[in-house]
């Protein structure tokens, strides 16, 4: 029987062990998509206790606590931090097979030096150990980033953000990790949302463009995008329910935009026509400015109306959606490609059933401008576990070129989540090692070491054109 979480955790062959320990493990981390708050980096936040660091905004953990019948006051309510931690520890011991069990114990070992197991009985001991450690300067926000060997972080930012914290981080000479903004204009895309009109007013104010039409909205978009680029932005992100393609004329879109600003409700077809026009315009701008376009879709958000009304979004009430027509995704990419405006694109679906669809679409739009110009994104959110990661890697290998894959990202709000890169690299090396062990690929260490090193770090540096 193997020891829990030993040095060869998830590594089942000699080839896997060699590839991980000699190569993948030694690569630094490039976190090109996350939800870290740049203000906490700029202020070098020192967390008071492990609950603030672990449970403050982690809806992954909140979902499991609710599944164990924990009262909401111990999750997002006014219970003490120590009580919340106790409830989490009692939940964790039941989470066999869940990646949170692995992530949590990896974090305890890598950052706090705790080699034991967290459960209801050990919660007080772990609480004390972690909180004593968190008082040290070596556990401030920046210090945790540095000790994780992170070289670059891309946050997720709205076009109206002033990026003041990114600027302050850049001016800090003692901190050499790049923290770059990511352009995420979802609120300008979501024309059907109740707050759209107010958001456009804010967008108008910040951009200095009087937005009265789709044409002037595009002018404001270009202006703010230019500001983001001047602040180091190299990638963009969109999170629609799915990638739609319902083309229309410029005149139609102007009419739809004017109708919405006038307070008139839109039909579903009008909504889709606007979103298609918006995304085609956005993709063209990204191509002109040599930016990467990331597309995250396949999520149905805020499913529990009662809880949403109390707690708001991002509290653990989202799920996988199974409506994502591959034909519309393909038509969208084709429209951009036909206009000579298809940027480097990473496609993520939250639904694992879309892996093969995405894998076959990728091959239709590759060209010599980049290695795997159109990429399938890493398994994320509800798929960010051993079977989900393995399935995504295997599908990509079956249908494309795994060696060109840009690899892992945390997609997280936590400064401890960099262990997810280790988790991913172990699974990657184990998968490749199994192919070698089974005689499906030669044991050529020179080639294999380059493949795992590239996927772990180097491909992302090249693909996004980061200057490191």
UniProtKB/Swiss-Prot annotation:
One of its GO terms (biological process) is D-glucuronate catabolic process. Pathway: Carbohydrate metabolism; pentose and glucuronate interconversion. It catalyses: D-glucuronate = D-fructuronate; aldehydo-D-galacturonate = keto-D-tagaturonate. One of its GO terms (molecular function) is glucuronate isomerase activity. InterPro entries: Metal_Hydrolase (IPR032466), Uronate_isomerase (IPR003766). It is an enzyme of class 5 (isomerase). The keyword Isomerase applies. The keyword Isomerase applies. Its EC number is 5.3.1.12. Keywords: Isomerase. Belongs to the metallo-dependent hydrolases superfamily. Uronate isomerase family. This is Uronate isomerase.
């Amino acid at each position: 029987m193997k020891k829990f979480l030993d040095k060869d955790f998830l590594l089942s062959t000699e080839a896997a062990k060699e590839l991980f320990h000699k190569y993948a493990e030694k690569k630094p981390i490039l976190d090109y998509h996350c939800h870290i708050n740049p203000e906490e980096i700029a202020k070098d936040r020192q967390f008071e206790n492990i609950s603030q660091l672990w449970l403050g905004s982690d809806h992954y953990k909140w979902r499991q606590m609710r599944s164990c019948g924990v009262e909401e006051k111990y999750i997002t309510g006014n219970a003490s931090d120590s009580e919340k931690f106790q409830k989490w520890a009692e939940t964790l011991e039941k989470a066999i097979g869940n990646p949170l069990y692995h992530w949590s114990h990896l974090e305890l070992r890598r950052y706090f030096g705790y080699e034991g197991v967290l459960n209801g009985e050990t919660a007080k001991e772990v609480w004390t150990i972690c909180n004593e450690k968190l008082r040290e300067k070596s556990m401030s926000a920046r210090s945790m980033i540095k000790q994780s060997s992170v070289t670059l972080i891309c946050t997720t930012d709205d076009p109206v953000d002033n990026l003041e914290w990114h600027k302050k981080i850049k001016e800090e000479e003692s901190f050499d990790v790049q923290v770059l903004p990511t352009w995420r204009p979802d609120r300008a895309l979501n024309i059907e949302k109740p707050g759209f009109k107010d958001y456009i007013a804010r967008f108008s104010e910040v951009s200095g463009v009087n937005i009265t039409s789709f044409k002037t909205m595009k002018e404001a978009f270009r202006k703010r995008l230019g500001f983001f680029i001047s602040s180091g932005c190299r990638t963009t992100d969109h999170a629609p329910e799915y990638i739609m393609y319902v083309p229309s004329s410029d005149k139609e879109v102007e009419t739809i935009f004017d109708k919405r600003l006038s307070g008139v409700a839109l039909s579903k077809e009008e909504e889709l026509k606007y979103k298609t026009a918006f995304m085609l315009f956005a993709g063209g701008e990204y191509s002109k400015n040599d930016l990467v376009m990331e597309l995250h879709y396949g999520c149905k958000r805020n499913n529990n109306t009662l809880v949403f009304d109390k707690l708001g979004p991002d509290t653990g009430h989202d799920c996988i959606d199974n409506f994502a027509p591959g034909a519309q995704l393909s038509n969208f990419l084709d429209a951009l490609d036909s206009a000579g405006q298809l940027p480097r694109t990473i496609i993520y679906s939250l639904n694992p059933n879309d892996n093969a669809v995405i894998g076959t679409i990728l091959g239709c739009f590759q060209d010599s401008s980049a290695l795997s110009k159109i990429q399938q994104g890493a398994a994320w959110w509800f798929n960010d576990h051993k079977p989900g990661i393995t399935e995504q890697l295997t599908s990509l290998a079956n249908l494309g070129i795994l060696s060109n894959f840009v690899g892992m990202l945390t997609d997280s709000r936590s400064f401890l989540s960099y262990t997810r890169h280790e988790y991913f690299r172990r699974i990657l090396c184990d998968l490749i090692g199994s192919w070698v062990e089974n005689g499906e690929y030669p044991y050529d260490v020179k080639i294999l070491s380059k493949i795992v090193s590239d996927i772990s770090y180097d491909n992302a540096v090249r693909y996004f054109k980061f200057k490191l």
